[in-house]
Amino acid sequence: MTTIYLNLILAFTLALSGVLIYRSHLLSTLLCLEGMMLSLFILMALTISHFHMFSLSMAPLILLVFSACEAGVGLALLVKTSNAHGNDHVQSLNLLQC
C-alpha cells in the first residue's frame, strides 16, 4: 500500500475517533462526519483512477452528493436545535418532538 492510501485511511480513522470522542456537540460531530466523507471521496477517486475502472467513475460524485445532502440536513438540524434550546448539545436532540 502506498503512503497516500495509508494517509487517507488514517484520516478516516481519526475522523471516526473524533465522532466517538467529541459527540457532546452537534457541530463537532458534523465536522468529523464531513472529514470521514471527504477521505472516503478521495480514497474512492484514487482507487478508481489507479485501477482504471472508469465504469465506476460516477461513484465518487454520487458519494459527494450524499455528503452534501447529509451536511445540509445536519446544518438544518443544528439551526433548529440551537433556535429551540439555545445550545448544540447532542442530548438536546431527544427533546425535539414534532
Curated annotation (Swiss-Prot):
GO annotation, cellular component aspect: mitochondrial inner membrane; respiratory chain complex I
One biological process term in Gene Ontology: ATP synthesis coupled electron transport
Cellular compartments annotated: Mitochondrion inner membrane
Transmembrane segments: 1-21, 26-46, 59-79
Record's bilayer topology term: Multi-pass membrane protein
Enzyme Commission number(s): 7.1.1.2
Claim: DNA-binding is one of the keywords in the record: no
PANTHER family assigned: NADH-UBIQUINONE OXIDOREDUCTASE CHAIN 4L, NADH-UBIQUINONE OXIDOREDUCTASE SUBUNIT ND4L
Name of the protein this chain belongs to: NADH-ubiquinone oxidoreductase chain 4L
Annotated gene: MT-ND4L
